[in-house]
Design a protein with these regions (language model features):
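Conserved SAM-binding loop
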Residues: 86-203, 215-233, 247-249, 321, ...
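N-terminal juxtadomain amphipathic helix
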Residues: 1-76, 236
Length: 405
């Protein structure tokens, strides 16, 4: 029996949901030499009976310490970060303070922070990303919150940032306690994670991916933060699908409670004596998976009967999961993505080739299905402007497809 990554309680034998033919990863994308050995995997989605955290009962991907972003420089994300930084700094009077982004990747969001009157630095585990960030003039060091005692260079800091990183961590409590030790008294933070509420509300089963080992709600995220020495000052849903919280370090020693399983937790969970969490209902996810499978394959059949072709736009975890679970390998021409490091590779499990947008002019597709929640309108505008009016544009919207043109 595996234990909860947040509180150490034993996970139930019966999962909430079993997903087969899932991509093994969203970032270690197969190339021409490795694609033949790549295959889909089975994942069990479970809920901790003590703290309520929904999670996969498996080992994390081997690159969970690294931050690899494809959409960091999109207009949507840059404007969101700019708004978040402005609010954080102005509301909490953080001008002139020392900020550190924990898991900063190439510095996509750190570069936006340099527009503001603060000291901006970052920590990143992946060496080649550290090099790129430094070449771009950013103050980034190589490191990771490996243990509670890990010391960040040039600390302590006044404010930390963590963008969609915590959900990858197999020991989220260790990471949070490490960050807390590297903050000054009263230090603050801004954290974002994908929202389980969003996934359940819109039955977006394609949001589930091996890379994201945990799926937080505001409640389970706040429980985790409280148990590891932070109080939540503000919380907000951003971009429809992401939880965003502003936190402050609490003072005093952190208690280390025994879990119901009798094990020391990896970093706290439900408070002793608190009520058991309500079971999460994932029946909508299972129904959505069946319906979307029928809808997408119905689209493929219609186009093929007319002698037409289909491409997907979005080599993200959503696109990978959709293509794999609906078994689109060999039925779709290619997946378009603007990230150069993905181009020339193959989608995990489905093995669809990933190409640059310019590939369309060499091999036009009659229809394009956008699978990139949060970026749909931005991508649709690009298709209209660059590919002409003859292309049929569709998008995955929540639990169904929608024709945009």
């Amino acid at each position: 029996m595996r234990a909860c990554i947040a509180c150490g309680c034993g996970l139930p034998e019966q999962p909430l949901m079993t997903l087969d033919h899932m991509p093994a990863s969203a970032q270690n994308i197969p190339d021409g030499e490795t694609v033949a050995a790549d295959e889909g995997i089975t994942l069990n989605l479970c809920q901790c009976p003590s703290c309520g955290l929904v999670q996969f009962d498996c080992e994390p991907v081997d690159y969970y310490r690294d931050v690899i972003r494809a959409g960091g420089f999109s207009t949507t994300m840059v404007e969101l970060r700019r708004r978040q930084y402005r609010h954080l700094i102005e509301t909490w009077h953080l001008e002139g303070k020392k900020f550190v982004e924990v898991g900063c990747g190439r510095g996509e969001f750190l570069s936006v922070l340099t527009e503001f009157p603060v000291s901006a630095s970052g920590i990143e585990h992946k060496e080649d990303l550290v090099k790129i960030a430094r070449e771009n003039g950013l103050q980034v060091t190589r490191g990771f919150a490996e243990t509670e005692e890990t010391v960040f260079p040039d600390g302590p800091y006044d404010v930390f940032l963590s963008f969609n990183f915590l959900e990858h961590q197999p020991e989220p409590g260790v990471m949070l306690r490490c960050i807390r030790r590297n903050l000054r008294e009263g230090g603050m933070g801004l954290i974002t994670v994908p929202s389980l509420e969003y996934i359940l509300q819109y039955d977006g089963y394609y949001e589930l991916i091996h890379d994201h080992i945990a799926y937080y709600t505001f409640e389970t995220l706040e429980n985790l933060l409280t148990a590891n020495g932070f109080e939540v000052l503000e919380r907000e849903m951003v971009n429809r699908d992401t939880l965003s919280v502003i936190v402050r370090r609490t003072e005093g020693e952190l208690a280390e409670e025994k879990s119901p399983a009798g094990e020391l937790p990896a970093g706290g969970g439900a408070a002793p004596g608190s009520r058991r969490p309500a079971p999460v209902d994932v029946s909508g996810l299972a129904a959505s998976r069946r319906y979307i499978d029928e809808e997408v394959n119905g689209l493929v059949d219609r186009l093929h009967s007319q002698g037409k072709t289909l491409a997907i736009w979005g080599a993200s975890h959503q696109g990978f999961t959709l293509a794999a679970t609906t078994r689109l390998g060999g039925k779709v021409s290619y997946i378009i993505d603007s990230a150069p490091f993905k181009q020339g590779r193959f989608a995990p499990a489905s093995h669809l080739p990933i190409v640059a947008p310019e590939h369309f002019f060499q091999e036009p597709a009659d229809a394009i299905l956008i699978v990139a929640p949060g970026y749909t309108e931005e991508i649709a505008s690009i298709i209209r402007e660059r590919f002409g009016k003859q292309v049929e544009i569709l998008a995955l919207k929540s639990n169904h497809m929608e024709t945009l043109r």
